[in-house]
């Protein structure tokens, strides 16, 4: 589930659109 975190720009290419990307999940 943390695969998208390794991506430089997960917001552009989110592996988990259901979560809304790691920015929504972490909030960063």
UniProtKB/Swiss-Prot annotation:
Subunit relationships: Component of the oligosaccharyltransferase (OST) complex.
Annotated compartments: Endoplasmic reticulum membrane
Disulphide bond pairs: none
Its job: Subunit of the oligosaccharyl transferase (OST) complex that catalyzes the initial transfer of a defined glycan (Glc(3)Man(9)GlcNAc(2) in eukaryotes) from the lipid carrier dolichol-pyrophosphate to an asparagine residue within an Asn-X-Ser/Thr consensus motif in nascent polypeptide chains, the first step in protein N-glycosylation. N-glycosylation occurs cotranslationally and the complex associates with the Sec61 complex at the channel-forming translocon complex that mediates protein translocation across the endoplasmic reticulum (ER). All subunits are required for a maximal enzyme activity.
Species: Gallus gallus (Chicken)
UniProt family annotation: Belongs to the OST1 family.
Gene label: RPN1
Name the record gives this protein: Dolichyl-diphosphooligosaccharide--protein glycosyltransferase subunit 1
Transmembrane segments: none
A GO cellular component annotation in the UniProt record: endoplasmic reticulum membrane
Keyword Transmembrane: yes
Keywords recorded for this protein, A-Z: Endoplasmic reticulum, Membrane, Transmembrane
Bilayer topology term: Single-pass type I membrane protein
Pathway(s) served: Protein modification; protein glycosylation
GO annotation (BP), single: protein glycosylation
């Amino acid at each position: 589930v943390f695969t998208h975190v390794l991506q430089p720009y997960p917001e552009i290419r989110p592996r988990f659109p259901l979560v809304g990307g790691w920015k929504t999940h972490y909030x960063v």
